[in-house]
């Protein structure tokens, strides 16, 4: 044996080693491509919701699970407060705390914040591995490797899993695909073991994200379609009954879920299909014992009776309130106009808006075109598993169109079906590729019916390689430029191309933390509640949980009212400071003026705010303007005055008058005014955050001080 004889592996071992190497590279790529934000800025938590998750995780790591589960947070929703343990999905926090304690057990010292920052990239690597195994079950290892490489860099998934994006979706997509993989294994084998593993994966999913409802409706739908197509078998019966029974019992252990799996409308489809499975099994048993004529009579009688009983019982339970109706968010998925017409608090969230056509190309690129190819392959070679992935693809496509947030659910199946499609195209043309030299081929060896077969195959393979390369470059660019900027720290390009950093948010929160009393109550719009509580450690009135529409409406009424009426509301709520976000100086478009109409709509959606009419804030021609042509109601409301106080003296651009708003591209209409019930406490360097102190009540005969 030569010195390098150990490298002489069998074909099977070389194949396994190559697969392992490619999959490992995809997992490493998945982790590393999500680190742009850390390299460009620092290890920092992004967005809004992740700050609440970080705060609760830190409490869990320091105080333990018992105190965490029974934690009453008096810093949120003043004066109501919030019970934390029973109002969250704890999977994310428990996962981070477990990793933190395991690392410390091995004397690897790491701050809990860094665990939170890097958790989503870590789980994206796990997602890559699960995607490989799932796609392999649907076609082969080649398709699995392609799908794994695609999901490693797909922008639709990266948008919620970059370093610092510490949200439920960071681990939920892994849980979802793991549940699907276990389900397909259970369906293929009919094994109770695989079905039990599927139920455990489903339990992890339930503990992590409210999107578990999609799973518990998709799996029963799959079973129902298998029944209708005559594919139902003992394997499906064992798999579904085990998953449903065990999964339902486990899911009910999550406090936030409780008895919903047996009481809410969202879970009734799963229960109904479970009942159908029992009826189907009973019918099969009767068919084996009766002759065809007897069976036909009995079957029709039983089906009619059972259907009538189920409809009657279901209607009675719905009417008596024993089965709760669908929630607003789920109604919005079935009727996209529902939230806009009935629940403005849901419609006001940007991620609940319908998806634009451009978003599909931006977040998926090549996958948009290869998805139908994979779908066609699955339809052409139907199996129980491929029927499931077809249903997953079609349903997630619809839901992603209704709500842009659900692009996250669509991205994995786009990668899976595109991986299958690309693999099938490459396999087809690879067979036609002849790598032998043309001058050595005899005329007999050449196919007279297809003389340019080799050239066509080579061209198609080169075209596919080109598209895959452009997909990689596009995904990397989108990740770097669009999805790697933490909202807590903003950046822009200067005239010379240099990067300018705006750190006003943290500047304002630290000012609040060090310059206000510990018991100070801060009023702001609900978007910033989690950040204020986590970074400023001050009590807030409303936050991103949005569980009490009446309380949020009261804040909206204060923002939309005149100073005098707003002062009454602020005294009622015991407000000490008011915080607003203003982008007129820097050009930051996601400020409170641009969100103001949602405050008006939500403020006027309750009985106490019936006097607030959205039309009052428009001009007679129906425009929302902040200049002299703007509505007098708008120009004199509290939000307008807090944002534009002293702004009329500021020059924002050359050759523009003072008080020129760079977001609205207009000179403000109300410049010369003073505040009666508030006093300016702090304005950040770039005027992005403005904080006002609420004046005390008048002394008799004296003005407010």
Curated annotation (Swiss-Prot):
Ranges annotated as spanning the membrane: 18-38, 120-138, 141-158, 170-189, 192-206, 212-228, 234-259, 268-287, 301-321, 357-379, 386-402, 407-428, 454-473
Keyword Endoplasmic reticulum appears in the UniProt entry: yes
GO (cellular component) term, any one: oligosaccharyltransferase complex A
Carbohydrate-modified residues: 537, 544, 548
Effect of residue 530 to A: In LLO mutant; abolished oligosaccharyl transferase activity due to defects in binding lipid-linked oligosaccharide
Membrane-protein topology: Multi-pass membrane protein
Motif (SVSE motif): 348-351
Effect of residue 530 to S: In CDG1WAD; uncertain significance; partial loss of function, when tested in a heterologous system; does not affect expression levels
Regulation: STT3A, but not STT3B, is specifically inhibited by the N-glycosylation inhibitor NGI-235, which prevents productive binding pose of the glycan donor in the active site of STT3A.
Subcellular localization, as worded in the UniProt entry: Endoplasmic reticulum; Endoplasmic reticulum membrane
Effect of residue 256 to P: Confers resistance to inhibitor N-glycosylation inhibitor NGI-1
Region (Interacts with target acceptor peptide in protein substrate): 525-527
Repeat is among the record's keywords: no
Result, substituting residue 266 to K: Confers resistance to inhibitor N-glycosylation inhibitor NGI-1
Major enzyme class: transferase
Site keyed Important for catalytic activity: positions: 160
Protein residues bound to Mn(2+): 49, 167, 169
Sequence motif DXD motif 1, location on chain: 47-49
Cytoplasmic side: 1-17, 139-140, 190-191, 229-233, 288-300, 380-385, 429-453
Reported function: Catalytic subunit of the oligosaccharyl transferase (OST) complex that catalyzes the initial transfer of a defined glycan (Glc(3)Man(9)GlcNAc(2) in eukaryotes) from the lipid carrier dolichol-pyrophosphate to an asparagine residue within an Asn-X-Ser/Thr consensus motif in nascent polypeptide chains, the first step in protein N-glycosylation. N-glycosylation occurs cotranslationally and the complex associates with the Sec61 complex at the channel-forming translocon complex that mediates protein translocation across the endoplasmic reticulum (ER).
Protein name: Dolichyl-diphosphooligosaccharide--protein glycosyltransferase subunit STT3A
Source organism of this protein record: Homo sapiens (Human)
Gene from which the chain derives: STT3A
């Amino acid at each position: 044996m030569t010195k390098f004889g150990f490298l002489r592996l069998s074909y099977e071992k070389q194949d396994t080693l190559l697969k392992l190497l490619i999959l490992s590279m995809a997992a490493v790529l998945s982790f590393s491509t999500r680190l742009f934000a850390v390299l460009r800025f620092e290890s920092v938590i992004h967005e809004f919701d992740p700050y609440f998750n970080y705060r609760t995780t830190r409490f869990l790591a320091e105080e333990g699970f018992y105190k965490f589960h029974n934690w009453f947070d008096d810093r949120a929703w003043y004066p109501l407060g919030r019970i934390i343990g029973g109002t969250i999905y704890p999977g994310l926090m428990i996962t981070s705390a477990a990793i933190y304690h395991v690392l410390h057990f091995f004397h690897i010292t790491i701050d809990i914040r860094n665990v939170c920052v890097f958790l989503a990239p870590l789980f994206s690597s796990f997602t890559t591995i699960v995607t490989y195994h799932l796609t392999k079950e649907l076609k082969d290892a080649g398709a699995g490797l392609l799908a794994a490489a695609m999901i490693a860099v797909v922008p639709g998934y990266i948008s919620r899993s970059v370093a610092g994006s510490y949200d439920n979706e960071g681990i939920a997509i892994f849980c979802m695909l793991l549940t699907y993989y276990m389900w397909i294994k259970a369906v293929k084998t009919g094994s109770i073991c695989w079905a039990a593993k599927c139920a455990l994966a489903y339990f992890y999913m339930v503990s992590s994200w409210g999107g578990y409802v999609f799973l518990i409706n998709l799996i029963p739908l799959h079973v129902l379609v298998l029944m209708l197509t005559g594919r139902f078998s003992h394997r499906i019966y064992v798999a579904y009954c085990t998953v449903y029974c065990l999964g339902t019992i486990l899911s009910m252990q999550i406090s936030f879920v409780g008895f919903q799996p047996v009481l809410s409308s969202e879970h009734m489809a799963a229960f109904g299909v479970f009942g159908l499975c029992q009826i189907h099994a009973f019918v099969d048993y009767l068919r084996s014992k009766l002759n065809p004529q007897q069976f036909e009579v009995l079957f029709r009688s039983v089906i009619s009776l059972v259907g009538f009983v189920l409809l009657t019982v279901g209607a009675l339970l719905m009417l008596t309130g024993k089965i709760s109706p669908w929630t607003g968010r789920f109604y919005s998925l079935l009727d996209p106009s529902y939230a806009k017409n009935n629940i403005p608090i849901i419609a006001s969230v940007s991620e609940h808006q319908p998806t634009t056509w451009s978003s599909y190309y931006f977040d998926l690129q090549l996958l948009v075109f290869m998805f139908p190819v994979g779908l066609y392959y699955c339809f052409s070679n139907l199996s129980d598993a491929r029927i499931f992935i077809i249903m997953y693809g079609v349903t997630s496509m619809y839901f992603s169109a209704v709500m842009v947030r659900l692009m996250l659910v669509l991205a994995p199946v786009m990668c899976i079906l595109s991986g299958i499609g690309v693999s099938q195209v490459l396999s087809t043309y690879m067979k036609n590729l002849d790598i032998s030299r043309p001058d050595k081929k005899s005329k007999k060896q050449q196919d007279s019916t297809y003389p340019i077969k080799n050239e066509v195959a080579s061209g198609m393979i080169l075209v596919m390689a080109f598209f895959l390369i452009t997909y990689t470059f596009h995904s990397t660019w989108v990740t770097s430029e669009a999805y790697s900027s933490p909202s807590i720290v903003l950046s822009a390009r200067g005239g010379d191309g240099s990067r300018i950093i705006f750190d006003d948010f943290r500047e304002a929160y630290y000012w609040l933390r060090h310059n206000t009393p510990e018991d100070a109550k801060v009023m702001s719009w609900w978007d910033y509640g989690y950040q204020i509580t986590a970074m400023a450690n001050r009590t807030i009135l409303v936050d991103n949980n949005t569980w009490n529409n009446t309380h949020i409406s009261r804040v909206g009424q204060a923002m939309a009212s005149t100073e005098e009426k707003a002062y009454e509301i602020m005294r009622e709520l015991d407000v000490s400071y008011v915080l607003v976000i203003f982008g007129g100086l820097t050009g930051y478009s996601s400020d409170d003026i641009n969100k103001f109409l949602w405050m008006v709509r939500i403020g006027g959606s309750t009985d106490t705010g019936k006097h607030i009419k959205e039309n009052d804030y428009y001009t007679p021609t129906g425009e929302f303007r902040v200049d002299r042509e703007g509505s007098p109601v708008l120009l004199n409301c509290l939000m307008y005055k807090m944002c534009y106080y002293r702004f009329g003296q500021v020059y924002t651009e050359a050759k523009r008058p003072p008080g020129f708003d760079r977001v609205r591209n207009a000179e403000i209409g109300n410049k010369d005014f003073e505040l009666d019930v508030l006093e300016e406490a702090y304005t950040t360097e770039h005027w992005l955050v403005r904080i006002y102190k609420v004046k005390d009540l008048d002394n008799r005969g004296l003005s407010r001080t």
